[in-house]
Amino acid sequence: MIKILLATDSFNQVNGVSTTYKNILNVTKRSVKVIHPGMFKNKSFKLYPEVEICYQPLKVYFKIKKINPTHIHIATEGTIGLIARLYCKLNNIPYSSAYHTKFPEYLKLMIGLPTSISYSFLKKFHRSSKAVLVPSNSCKKELLKKGFDNLTLWTRGVSKDLIAPLPKQKKINKSKKIKVLSVGRLSKEKNIEELCLLQDKFEITIVGDGPQYQFLKNKYNNISFLGYKFGKDLAKIYASHDVFCFTSETDTFGIVIIEALCNGLPVAAKNVTGPKDIVAHKQNGFLGSNLELSIIKCSNYNKTNIKKIARKNWSWRNAEKMLFDSLLK
């Protein structure tokens, strides 16, 4: 009998990793057990407060032993992931893993740690995995150059409750400001302040929270900061804007990009890993180094066509199949 365990250091937070696995669990017909830091004593990671660090390794190990899985998917490289990997190695359990986040780049930005050290750790962590799931082709190419093995592409999806009916599209009046939306964590590595600097050029709405929330809200008075929004409320916000702006240059994917596209929003972003794997330049968005220009360029793209094509391309059921096929093959 197949018994699958999902081991993750990120499950209760609002981020792309948690969103991915919760949606996978919502659509799967398989029986999957989950182990995460919220089940044990934990502390927040100082550099990334939303991440919980579990400090009860023996309890985690014996919890896994009690579940007695035949296959394990290790979602993250934190303490839960490390203990799950150790369990697999000691008990000859097949496992797959996933690469979600460019933590080496984050750590270099935050504390100056050379990326070579972090990537050396990650390479060793994923070395025995039967399949290392990556979110995009450009991410896969980057990791191959760094010496990673067994890389497998893993797509994402969008939930139905995050898709709202499109209002009738009108050509944007040049005398009115373009309505620009950004959704995500408000922190230094997300580069959101580059968009904030354009507060006098566009009507900007920012959805999300994080370490920079209060700082940005106090500094940029012409921007609407809404905090976290979910489900249908978030879908309505997507549908009521003209352009979605994705500012990060260090993400491996960007689920919010496909959420925006599935609501018909053209995307303005940098030509970097993540956006360039999702956005068709000059078709459903504009990729370039100048965010202001990119926003203006894609502001009158056909939202109905963007939405129609995006909804065909992104499915959680397809993502679920890819995840478990790679684990059970």
Regions found by a protein language model. Name each.
Residues 1-40, 321, 328:
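N-terminal subdomain of nucleotide-sugar transferases
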Residues 20, 35, 120-166:
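Donor nucleotide-sugar binding/catalytic pocket of nucleotide-sugar-dependent glycosyltransferases
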Residues 126, 228-229, 236-241:
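Short alpha-helical donor nucleotide-sugar binding micro-motif in glycosyltransferases
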Residues 173-190, 196-205:
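Conserved donor-binding/catalytic core segment of Leloir-type glycosyltransferases
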Residues 214-232:
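Nucleotide-activated donor-binding/catalytic signature segment of Leloir-type glycosyltransferases, i.e.
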Residues 266-269:
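Short hydrophobic beta-strand element within catalytic cores of glycosyltransferases
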Residues 293, 300-329:
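A charged, aromatic-enriched C-terminal amphipathic alpha-helix characteristic of glycosyltransferases
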